[in-house]
């Protein structure tokens, strides 16, 4: 994920083309200048004029401030700075769950420390956001059914509990990495559903589109499990949950 915004800074001219160095490729000279462990949690910026090193949000503000000094001043106002500091940590501690990499399992990886608080915040954020959007989407699938948010919230909670129960035994100490990636798959599916809510298509269309989105989520779930070497079992369990609770949902709706 660091690559995403560092490349963005380069393309926008806020950072020199040679001003970026991938964590897995840093030289011994750079390692001697920075706190390697800290830089896994907070991106490091070396100010070449005086060899001063700044980390995390401060490094981003320094880069932005070179091109947009007013934005930097606004971001440093206490309430805003407090918010952006938490937002930075929220993204940083969960960035490998948002965009995983095969390099995450290598020796010279840049995987941040595990922070339970921010991982739980991430799971809760995706859970609430997904339940909210799916509540609206369910109205397109089942126009006569009420309490869509409550039902979707329950299903999203059950998905976490289901996978935690089964995968906790299989993945053991890697369960939190899996849950973060699983919820990112849910977030992807939720985002794909949103555009369809701005139009009024037929009920059949919404069922077909929902099926397409679930298939995309299935492929993404497989891809992430392959990258992180979780194996096929998490995907099988994930699909069993979808099928089981999909059948339960249809039963509830048809008898409501």
Language-model features: where?
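Thiol-based oxidoreductase modules, predominantly thioredoxin-like and allied folds used
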Residues: 14-31, 40
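Local sequence-structure signature of Cys/Sec-based thiol-disulfide redox active-site neighborhoods
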Residues: 1-17
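Final/C-terminal transmembrane alpha-helix of multipass membrane proteins
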Residues: 233-256
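Hydrophobic core of alpha-helical transmembrane segments in multi-pass integral membrane proteins
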Residues: 124-133, 160-164, 246-247
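Thiol/selenol-based redox catalytic cores and closely related redox-interacting motifs
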Residues: 30-140, 191, 195-205, 209-228
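Alpha-helical transmembrane segments forming the membrane-embedded cores
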Residues: 135-239
């Amino acid at each position: 994920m660091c690559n995403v915004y560092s490349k963005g800074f380069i393309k926008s001219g806020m950072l020199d083309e040679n001003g970026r160095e991938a964590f897995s490729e840093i030289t011994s000279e750079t390692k001697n200048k920075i706190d390697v462990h800290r830089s896994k949690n907070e991106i490091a910026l070396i100010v070449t004029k005086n060899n001063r090193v700044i980390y995390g949000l401060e490094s981003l503000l320094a880069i932005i401030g070179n091109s947009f000094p007013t934005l930097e001043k606004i971001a440093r106002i206490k309430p805003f700075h407090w918010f952006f500091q938490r937002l930075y940590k929220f993204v940083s501690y969960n960035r490998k769950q948002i965009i995983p990499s095969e390099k995450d399992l290598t020796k010279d990886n840049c995987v941040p420390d595990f922070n339970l608080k921010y991982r739980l915040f991430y799971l809760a954020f995706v859970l609430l956001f997904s339940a909210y959007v799916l509540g609206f989407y369910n109205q397109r699938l089942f126009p006569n059914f009420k309490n869509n948010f409550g039902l979707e919230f329950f299903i999203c909670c059950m998905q976490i509990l289901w996978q935690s129960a089964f995968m906790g035994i299989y993945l053991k100490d890697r369960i939190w990495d899996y849950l973060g990636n699983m919820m990112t798959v849910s977030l992807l599916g939720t985002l794909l559903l949103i555009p369809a809510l701005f139009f009024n298509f037929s009920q059949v269309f919404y069922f077909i589109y929902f099926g397409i989105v679930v298939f995309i989520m299935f492929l993404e779930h497989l891809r992430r499990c392959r990258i992180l070497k979780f194996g096929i079992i998490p995907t099988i369990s994930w699909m069993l949950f979808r099928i089981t609770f999909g059948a339960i949902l249809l039963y509830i709706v048809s008898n409501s």
